Curated annotation (Swiss-Prot):
GO biological process: DNA-templated transcription
CC cofactor: Zn(2+)
Function comment: DNA-dependent RNA polymerase catalyzes the transcription of DNA into RNA using the four ribonucleoside triphosphates as substrates.
EC number: 2.7.7.6
Protein name per Swiss-Prot or TrEMBL: DNA-directed RNA polymerase subunit beta''
Top-level taxonomy: Eukaryota, Sar, Stramenopiles, Ochrophyta, Bacillariophyta
Transmembrane parts of this sequence: none
SUPFAM superfamilies (UniProt xref): beta and beta-prime subunits of DNA dependent RNA-polymerase (SSF64484)
Binding residues for Zn(2+): C217, C285, C292, C295
Cellular compartments annotated: Plastid, Chloroplast
Domain of life, source organism: Eukaryota
Organism annotation: Thalassiosira pseudonana
Alphabetical list of Pfam families matching this protein: RNA_pol_Rpb1_3 (PF04983), RNA_pol_Rpb1_4 (PF05000), RNA_pol_Rpb1_5 (PF04998)
Top enzyme class: transferase
Length: 1446
């Protein structure tokens, strides 16, 4: 054994490890194993010579335990009191309890250890605990300290600890609580092994084809190892240097490139103080689907360079998966004890005064235990000046992020806590906890003095106790203040009142309150001279005829529950007039003044002034005449093709308002005439050959057009056909004259008595139509009918009473047009143009509650009516009162006759026990409530005790917490205090921050970047944009270019989004001008300035935005604020992928705020939610968090970020916006992520980096103000660099999980796997390549394709990097046999078959499945040779071809 220094010390577990490692690296594995054997025999030899015994007496419980428990209990009581006083929230109290217990249990453990160390170093328990063999400290702590806090089944902490230990014995509750953890350990072991096995399978599947195939890939990229970054020497040994290392002083060569790093070499670097060197890694290797020897480095099992043909992928998969199976066993041993690292505390050694150094910067912060502390923003120091002058001044160094519980110049006692470090690596879970009210009561929010400029405010609200009673609708109160109220007396009453007289009847009496109803029936009404008759065949589902004063109406009736009565179904329309006055023979076109309808549908116009209003004469002169005449001319042009002009809303709205908005308007009389042009239409579907007439023929009445179809009118036929099939035949009724010179008669109207061409007499109003055929000119004279439509009027006396009292229904005649004006009704049957209905409207009653039954009475020739009114109780009970204790009492008997407007009964809300009222308040908002403060809710206090407070002030009693509340009455000696309890909500959203500006945005032209004085540059380059225009001439060299859009940044609810802006449509601006008149304070909108830029695009998504700057300054706004509206249209069609709204700020920037859900003065019931609090829970750091976390990282899950409460109030933005120098001089550049890597969504980070690398940077040259903009990197470079960043992120995240579990895995294994996850890109624009958009290809592949394409001056493809999880990556394996044998077999195989893919059998799995020798290890030689043979044979073939040519 050469150069081994003899160690004459105690050798424990750690030294043993070092000894064996030394012998392994110095000699070899044989020697090391022999040494291990020898050590084993040595150990056994001495173990048999001296024994160790353990008895129950060795378990000594430290004497200080009781003191500590008492102190902890006292702290907890204190916390409860503070909480009741409203200084801390419920959640903070919980946190405080847990902290108190974990500190107590930790310090108890330290006591145990120090006790053993000083008094009993050979105690067998102590020896076992520190031997490093099996037992550990946490078990000793359970034996002789206290078991401490336990975790419940979901991994959260229970707030009651187990105070006993195993030496003292557990109580029954303790025992039950212990059961949770133990069970969890067993279950985990059973279930989690499967998980870890599956993880291994996926890892091996993704990396199975990675084999060492080359000696050197000649890469130029590498990792820079920096001495400032705390690197692990373990991870560096066995790597290979990329660049040579020189001595910084003498500039001599220390290590050449491609040297393997050994421990000696690293030590040499340390001596020479070489801080930076470059190493290779599997991530930097250039080979495709394999790795070269140099990049991989040592094979760790024999400390030599890895062999060619070694299957490193499978090694990597196994090395990562195997610890998973071990990790599952972790919880089993400790039995589910909750272990949280105790915080490192700074404890004052002496009494003295604290002073901070000048450079120490602090901010005020509220911790999750509700303490206000100072947090150091940079590292610095503080000094403690002791009381005694003889003692020395003590200086304490502070790190960054230390919490200080003291302020500067504060006096502090010995062993008080000065500060503590914030630990960052705890595993926590942020939750929201609803805070419920303990008692019913009234909410009172006192105003706190706060600084107004904070985004969040602290809220304090009191709940002052009392009883809340809800009232039914329309109720009245039933008592006065100072009353005593007996049990079961009522507070509210609602009267139930009927509308009509009649007989009463109560239905559903024994069911619950909501279903009960009271019915009042009256049979005294009738219709004279009328009867009802059943129609055998219902016409349009109307099944009865109502004969009334010799008029017939159609009516719908159904059978009612009694024999002779029929029940009406509808009241609107009640009956439809049955006459043929408006019935036409055939179809046609009808015209009427559309404004008649518009009385009813006026909401369909933008401003409901239409041309139905005339302008008064004097206003007419104001408008320039020509303007008005133009406008009338425009109207004249809008003449229907049949020669009628009808007032439609022809005018577009701008012209209208320009004329009409400025004038007083007069109503113009509208005539209800209707013009009818008949045109008979047959819809057919038949062959051309059956037709018996031709297009343009004139036929007589009753003429057969096609077999079995006979015309009803005479006229000209028009036939429309499609594909030799006749679709439609129309007959325009009228008389036809042959001749010439008919043009001037076209579209003219003639009236009876006029004569055309001296020989044609007109007998009825007609329209002339000129028909020009190839053969001849024809003049068609079409007669039209004019119908006059009666005005609607109210029928007064339709229903009469026996006593002739006033009727109970309002009856209206309603006329409805069944067709639109100008609409062609294509039919040959009879149609009704209008329908005349009678509508009934019951006076002063809810419509649905009245039911009408009819019955014929032939003796008296009248129709009897029976009117029933239903009073449903549920109409009087609002929805929120459905399940409260409402009662009701009836004052009427069944079948009693009552007059109208009688009180039938009451709905009441009862009181459960008798009270003496001190005070009451009632509210009449949307919910009616009464709040009673009775003696039970009050306490009386002597005035001296109440610190001389007067009425309406709040009292907090420090000693007796129950005596807290608001003073109601002060009578000089005693105070009556209404009990109350404060609740505290820190960091609530202040109302100011919810500005009403919902969506703000800023538009940016194409080339300007926007800069505010804040350090945010919003410059966002989106790579997924597709190019729009590709019309290029045949001889032009074509290059890919992208469409540029102006950018738009949108801010909504404090989040920023960016969107490449599509087409602008309109820019409205509504300018408010304030009137100078005093009497009208209203702002009138005076004018609309509307600029129109019409773009006719079909597929658009219109959007109206209110313009504003992104950041408004309330103080500086002196300019009048214009409400600019911008109408945007988003193109729907080609852009749904790329043009949209992208979020710029992720949710990391969101602050967590607590919410309060109630307003001042509200009454709430017991158990209602007052607000929500956010809080962090620590969860036990065992395997349950380990394996799933690793799986989540390797599967690259897109999880929503769950925010951790960082120490400061505002979340640190995880991507620091510009390069900024931190006050503790840590230099951070854009895009460096801060430690929170477990909360980062890797996909988003990928996007952010990629966009960053694609930014156009501007380079300025100052003399001529010459600016040049240049993109940072090209597409390949950007993707490559982005991938590198993400690879490191995932690597560090996975390693941190394994390290937290105490498992060490060599980085290179993880690197192999991660390399496989980050090779693919997604094509966004294909250019001239044969690829498709959204296709997934390898990065090196697309680079190769683009190289060739650019060499030919064609357009390259554009792409974005894609991160695949291990399952996805395994399915995207280039070999379809490997992918199909992994998962989703049929899908993978069908896809491969359709694409016609070829499997080159490169990996191990494919070859095993086919049955070949695997291409690694011994099979590697034959595998690499087969490629060489191929190449040789190819060249031979080429030679032969050349020979033939010669």
């Amino acid at each position: 054994m050469k150069d081994y220094i003899y160690q004459n010390t105690l050798i424990n577990k750690k030294q043993l490890k070092e000894l064996l490692a030394w012998s392994f690296s110095k000699y070899d594995s044989m020697q090391a194993s022999l040494l291990a054997d020898e050590l084993k025999y040595l150990g056994f030899k001495y173990a048999t010579q001296a024994g160790i015994s353990i008895s129950i007496e060795d378990l000594k419980v430290p004497a200080t335990k009781n003191e500590m428990l008492e102190k902890a209990n006292k702290d907890i009581l204190n916390a409860e009191k503070i909480c009741l006083k409203g200084k801390i929230t419920d959640v903070e109290r919980f946190q405080k309890i847990i902290d108190t217990w974990s500190i107590a249990s930790e310090s108890l453990k330290d006591n145990v250890v120090s006790y053993f160390k000083t008094y009993d170093p050979l105690n067998s328990v102590y020896i076992m605990a520190f031997s490093g063999a099996r037992g550990n400290l946490s078990q000793v702590r359970q034996l002789v300290g206290m078991r401490g806090l336990m975790a419940d089944p979901s991994g959260e902490i229970m707030r009651v600890p187990i105070k006993k230990n195993f030496r003292e014995g557990l109580t029954i509750t303790d025992y039950l609580m212990s059961g949770y953890g133990a069970r969890k350990g067993i279950v985990d072991t059973a279930l989690k092994t499967a998980n870890s096995g599956y993880l291994t399978r996926r890892l091996i599947d993704i990396a199975q084809d990675i084999v060492i195939r080359e000696k050197d890939c000649l890469t130029s990229s590498s990792f820079l190892i920096d001495s400032q970054t705390k690197f692990d020497t373990e991870q560096l040994i066995g790597r290979v240097l990329l660049k040579s290392v020189y001595d910084s002083k003498t500039e001599k060569l220390i290590a050449k490139a491609n040297t393997q790093l050994t421990l000696d070499l690293l030590n040499l670097f340390n001596q020479k103080q070489i801080s930076k060197f470059y190493i290779r890694s599997p991530l930097t290797c250039n080979l495709y689907h394999s790795i070269c020897q140099m990049c991989y480095g040592w094979d760790l099992s024999n400390q030599n360079l890895v062999d060619l043909g070694e299957a490193v992928g499978i090694l990597a998969g196994q090395s990562i998966g195997e610890p998973g199976t071990q990790l599952t066993m972790r919880t089993f041993h400790t039995g589910g004890i909750f272990t949280s690292e105790a915080r490192q505390q700074i404890i004052s050694p002496k009494n003295g005064i604290i002073k901070f150094s000048k450079i120490l910067k602090t901010i005020i912060l509220r911790t999750n235990r509700g303490e206000d502390v100072l947090l150091t923003k940079n590292s610095g120091s503080l000094i403690l000046i002791p009381e005694k002058h003889t003692d020395e001044i003590i200086q304490i160094e502070l790190l960054r992020n230390t919490m200080l519980f003291v302020k500067s110049n504060q006096y502090i006692k010995q062993s008080a806590i000065i500060g503590e470090l914030i630990s960052t690596d705890k595993q926590t879970l942020t939750e929201r906890k609803p805070i419920l009210s303990d008692t019913a009561g009234e909410i009172f929010i006192p105003r706190l003095k706060t600084r107004m400029n904070l985004i969040t405010q602290n809220r304090l609200l009191w709940i002052l106790s009392g009883q809340v009673y809800q009232a039914p609708s329309n109720s009245f109160l039933n008592f006065y203040t100072d009353h005593k109220i007996n049990k079961n007396s009522y507070i509210f009453r609602t009267k139930l009142i009927n509308q009509y007289s009649g007989y009463t009847k109560v239905l559903n009496q024994n069911k619950n309150l909501l279903e009960q109803k009271i019915q009042i029936t009256n049979e005294t009404y009738f219709l004279e001279n009328s009867y009802v008759q059943k129609i055998l065949k219902p016409i349009t589902n109307k099944n009865y005829l109502l004969n009334f004063n010799n008029l017939t109406y159609l009516i719908t009736l159904k059978d009612s529950n009694s024999k002779n009565w029929k029940r009406c179904k509808k009241y609107k329309p009640f009956a439809t007039s049955f006459n043929n006055n408006f019935k036409t023979l055939t179809g046609g076109i009808m015209y009427y003044d559309q404004r008649i309808k518009q009385k009813f549908d006026s909401f369909n116009t933008l401003i409901s002034y239409n041309i139905a209003y005339e302008i008064s004469k004097e206003d007419y002169d104001k408008v320039s005449k020509d303007h008005y005449e133009n406008y009338l001319k425009k109207l004249e042009n809008k003449i229907d093709k049949n020669g009628f002009i009808f007032y439609q809303n022809f005018l577009n709205y701008q012209e209208m308002e320009s004329i009409f908005l400025k004038f007083k308007l007069k109503k113009k009389i509208v005539h209800n005439s209707l013009i009818w042009l008949s045109e008979e239409t047959y819809k057919l579907n038949c062959d051309k050959n059956i037709l018996l007439v031709e297009n343009g023929n004139f036929i007589a009445k009753n003429f057969e057009i096609i077999p079995n179809i006979i015309s009803k009118t005479a006229g000209i036929i028009t036939v429309s056909q499609k594909n030799n099939m006749i679709e439609e035949i129309a007959i325009k009724a009228g008389f036809v004259y042959q001749g010439k010179q008919f043009e001037q008669l076209d579209k003219k109207v003639y009236y009876p008595g006029e004569i055309i061409f001296d020989n044609i007499k007109i007998t009825q109003p007609s329209l002339c139509e000129h028909i020009n055929n190839k053969s001849n000119n024809q003049l068609l004279i079409r007669p039209f009918a004019i119908y006059e439509i009666p005005k609607e009027k109210t029928v007064k006396s339709l229903f009469s009473d026996k006593n002739n009292s006033k009727s109970i229904f309002t009856i209206t005649n309603k006329i409805t047009y069944l067709y639109k004006t100008n609409q062609k009704i294509k039919t040959s049957n009879h149609i009704n143009l209008i329908s005349q209905n009678i509508n009934l409207k019951a006076k002063n009653s809810v419509q649905n509650n009245t039911i009408i039954d009819l019955s014929n009475s032939f003796k008296t020739k009248r129709l009897n009516l029976r009117i029933s009114e239903n009073l449903l109780l549920k109409h009087y009970i609002p929805a929120h009162l459905k399940y409260t204790n409402l009662q009701y009492c009836l004052l009427v008997e069944p079948t009693q006759f009552i007059d109208s407007y009688t009180t039938l009964g009451y709905l009441e809300s009862l009181i459960t026990n008798s009270l003496e009222i001190v005070k009451f308040k009632s509210k009449r908002a949307n919910k009616k409530q009464v709040f009673l403060i009775s003696n039970k809710d009050c306490i009386t206090v002597r005035k001296e005790q109440g610190k001389n407070k007067t009425a309406n002030e709040l009292i907090i009693d420090n000693i007796n917490v129950n005596q807290t509340g608001k003073v109601l009455i002060d009578n000089g000696q005693f105070l009556t205090v209404q009990k109350g309890r404060p609740y505290f909500f820190p960091n609530c959203k202040s109302d100011d921050s919810k500005e009403k500006l919902d969506l703000q945005y800023k538009l940016i032209g194409l080339n300007n970047t926007i800069s505010n004085n804040t350090n945010t540059f919003l410059n966002y380059y989106d790579v997924t944009k597709r190019s729009l225009v590709e019309r290029l001439g045949p001889n032009k060299k074509s290059y890919g270019f992208k469409v540029k859009f102006s950018k738009m940044f949108i801010k909504k609810n404090g989040k920023f989004y960016s969107s490449p802006i599509p087409l602008f449509l309109n820019n409205f601006s509504i300018i408010k001008e304030e009137q100078k008149r005093l009497n009208e304070g209203k702002n009138e909108i005076n004018n609309f300035i509307i600029k129109n830029t019409q773009l006719k695009i079909k597929q658009c998504l219109p959007l109206l935005l209110k313009s504003s700057e992104l950041v408004t300054n309330k103080i500086k706004r002196k300019t009048p604020f214009n409400n600019n509206l911008t109408g945007l249209k988003f193109l729907k069609y080609p852009f749904n992928k790329s043009i949209g709204i992208h979020s710029l700020t992720e949710d990391y920037f969101e602050q967590e705020v607590n919410n309060v859900y109630c307003k001042n003065g509200e009454f709430i019931e017991k158990g209602e939610v007052i607000g929500l609090l956010n809080f962090e829970k620590e969860i036990t750091g065992d395997i349950v968090q380990g394996l799933p976390r690793i799986e989540e990282l390797l599967e690259a899950r897109k999880k929503k970020p769950t925010n951790k409460h960082l120490a400061t109030n505002q979340k640190k933005s995880l991507l620091i916006q510009k390069t900024s120098i931190d006050s503790s001089f840590e230099f951070q550049k854009l895009g460096t992520t801060i430690k929170e890597n477990d909360k980062i969504n890797p996909h988003n980070l990928l996007k952010i980096y990629f966009n960053y690398y694609g930014i156009k940077k501007q380079f300025f040259s100052n003399k001529e103000m010459f600016a040049l903009s240049y993109r940072l990197t090209d597409n390949y470079e950007a993707s490559y660099r982005t991938f590198k960043k993400i690879q490191l992120l995932i690597l560090n995240a996975v390693q941190s999980v394994y390290e937290s579990q105490g498992v060490s895995i060599a980085n290179k294994h993880l690197e192999v796997i991660i390399k496989q996850m980050t090779t693919k890109v997604l094509i966004t624009h294909e250019g001239h390549t044969p690829l498709l958009p959204r296709e997934v290809v390898d990065l090196y592949h697309i680079q190769y394709i683009n190289k060739i394409i650019e060499a030919h001056n064609k357009r390259p493809a554009y792409y974005v990097p894609l991160l695949l999880g291990i399952t996805k990556a395994a399915l995207n394996n280039p070999s379809f046999i490997s992918a199909a044998s992994f998962q989703e077999t049929t899908r993978v195989l069908t896809k491969a078959a359709i694409e016609g893919r070829v499997d080159w059998l490169r990996g191990l799995k494919e070859n095993i499945i086919i049955g070949h020798l695997i291409p690694s290890g011994t099979g590697y030689q034959s595998y690499s040779n087969c490629f060489n043979q191929l190449a040789q044979s190819k060249t031979k073939i080429n030679l032969e071809k050349i020979k033939i040519k010669i």
